């Protein structure tokens, strides 16, 4: 009997201890949850009371919207609107300035002759601000070099400034500096100097893709499409996972009027980067040009499913109606 009593008492003690343990664990967890909740509330209050944090978050949101719209050049007006707000909220972010410059350039096609002269200075200003915000970015400096090379003097173009920026790039990366200077020489009409630097860059880093990309564009510019295709094939070989390599190869094929090869290259670029929706529209146009109305109709519909609004979407609807008859 005493044994049974002791067993019951021991059982009660064990259950009581277990309940106390569970209760203590629950209290610890509850305390942790409360602390986290208070921390989140404090973070929220700190966010609400801090214009800097709030503006940075808003700027990031506008930036993302701008970049999304920039995927479709015909939506560049919307991209500009969002990216201008991002820059307004955070003027210290070089990427925001750079992408706003990209949006202005994308808008050139739709700006017309009257607005173009007003857009060019904005491109220059945003690129200069991007470089100021991030002086070690070779991407921003290269974009500024290209502006100085291609813009007329009245809009801020300057070969001297382009070479100066190329010198700055060379201080960061000798290889990229050679390519930048080569591009400036090409713009100046110094083809021999440009080609010499392109070849020197390839020799110094045969496994890097940038020289093949730049040299290919140079050949496109002087109308040597066969040489351009050779360079872009090499570009795609050393950078097979880059959508841009296949796009550039396709672009050269298109200028050579090698349309089946063009379509295959563009499809590969789309496979690697589905956000390149303008290529779907381009493929539809190529099929239409080749006389394949069924595939053209299919690709225009495909484009509309991806981009239901915008200038190009309106054009796609017109094409779908025309090809249906």
Predicted regions and their residues:
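Register position in tetratricopeptide repeats
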Residues: 71-72, 106, 110-113, 150-151, ...
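Start-of-helix register in tetratricopeptide repeats
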Residues: 60, 95, 102, 139, ...
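Residue-level recognition of tetratricopeptide repeat
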Residues: 67, 102, 109, 146, ...
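Canonical tetratricopeptide repeat
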Residues: 64, 99, 143, 180, ...
